[in-house]
Amino acid sequence: MSIGCKIVKDFQRPAPELVTRFKDMPVANIDDNMGRIAAVDAAIEPIGYKGQLLGTAFTVRVPQGDNLMFHAAMDLAKPGDVIVIDAGGFTDRAIFGELMATYCKARGIKGIVCDGAIRDRGGLAAMEDFHVYARSATPNGPYKNGPGEINVPVVIGGKLVRPGDIVVGDDDGVLFIDPAIAAELADATEA
């Protein structure tokens, strides 16, 4: 898939009450109620698991090994968002590390899910109240050439993710929930 240059600054976010319906629900239980095929590829793992990740997807698509649009995304995302980066599964260059994650945390962003590589694994694992899921780690830094896209549908670990999807992660993995089915899914998972 070719990557253009597009920035969608805002999108419809689900009501906070809908997102919090999934608080403390295990990803495995939610996945069971989504046909047992909703979780992303198991290669995308938590970096230093710290409890549940819960928020709203703020999507970014970047060229392999390039993080120019991630810089823009950090400033556009809102508190409660989870930045979801489609890096095409490329693992030879990190998209971000501890410094960028620290900036995101200071802005109220809940975490980052990256279908690509990160760096500073130890620093990311030690961060409190900030969650990172990634395909791998490498010390190699990124390019900053662009282009890239913000708040467009992306693919993470083989699953479609749209801006505004509900993000739920735990030590088993991460999945994304379409807000249109979220209330019914929460009811089924609570039962």
Which residues are covered by each model-predicted region?
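Feature captures the catalytic cores and cofactor-binding loops of soluble hydro-lyases/lyases
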Residues: 2-163, 176-191
